[in-house]
Amino acid sequence: MKIAVLSGKGGTGKTLVSVNLAAVALDSVYIDCDVEEPNGHLFFQPKDLQKERVTVKLPQADPELCTGCRTCVNFCKFNALAYIKNKLIVFNEVCHSCGGCLLFCPQKAISEKEREIGLIQSGISGNVRVVSGMMNIGEVSGVPIIKKLLQDSRKENKNVFLDCPPGSACMVMESIKDADYCILVAEPTVFGVHNLEMVYELVRIFQKPFGVVLNKCLEEENPAEDFCLQNQITILEKIPFDLELGTMHSNGQIAVRKHPKYKELFLNLLKTVSKEARHETASDT
């Protein structure tokens, strides 16, 4: 089962939830899809690290064969190509590596070269296999890295926890495509409702079963909880505003490995999520 954990912004508690769920599961895989700022490995401190380069294909033209017909330039809808002063110019950052220019070039003047955009790091931490995507500084998009992460995860026959990027943009969409269930993490504020609504709309578009974890809850009014009740959204768990839990997390510690009360909290959450996911799967068959 693949469980994606997402939130409308950073700092909501997405990594807190995904790291502790992966740690409390008997045998699991934690995948950090937040390739711009991966931090899950800082908690797990995995051993026996392995690294794999992630590359994309970029076009290059043979000046001896290129006639300047501009077929490739006209084809590219991303404006990644320009023909200037008798030379084909490739804008690497805009290219989506679709390969269309290579296919449509009538002179067969275009070939492809590899360009590294990041890496995938994997290792072991106790009962958890920890996999992190890491995008090189200055890159425009981490989607190819996430695609590679998810491609590799299809081989896993374990519970897989996907720590998604914050927000609801392209990288988040790519992260949840293969998810069996989505956990939306929200804060108990009016601003938290706005962020929750963004990812709520996203999972509905992707027709993914989902539930909400309310983090940093106080005894006061909870606008995020009100939003869930109004929209008949399943509340999976309410995590209280807890100085001890926050301090552990800020110090890079995994709460379920440090204190039995947090182990019980996240174990109950895992049981609830598993039950909800099985129920949704049964409803679809």
State where each predicted segment sits.
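Short, well-ordered beta-strand core segments
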Residues: 4, 28, 182-183
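Switch II (G3) loop of P-loop NTPases
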Residues: 34, 132-138, 146-171
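Walker A (P-loop) phosphate-binding motif
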Residues: 1-25
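Iron-sulfur cluster-binding cysteine motifs and their immediate structural context
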Residues: 71-89, 100-115
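Inter-motif core of Ras-like GTPase G domains
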Residues: 169-190, 196
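Ferredoxin-like iron-sulfur electron-transfer modules
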Residues: 8, 21-24, 45-68, 79-97, ...
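C-terminal lobe/tail of nucleotide-utilizing enzymes
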Residues: 202-285
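Short beta-strand-centered segment that lines the nucleotide-binding/catalytic pocket of NTP-utilizing
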Residues: 28-41, 114-119
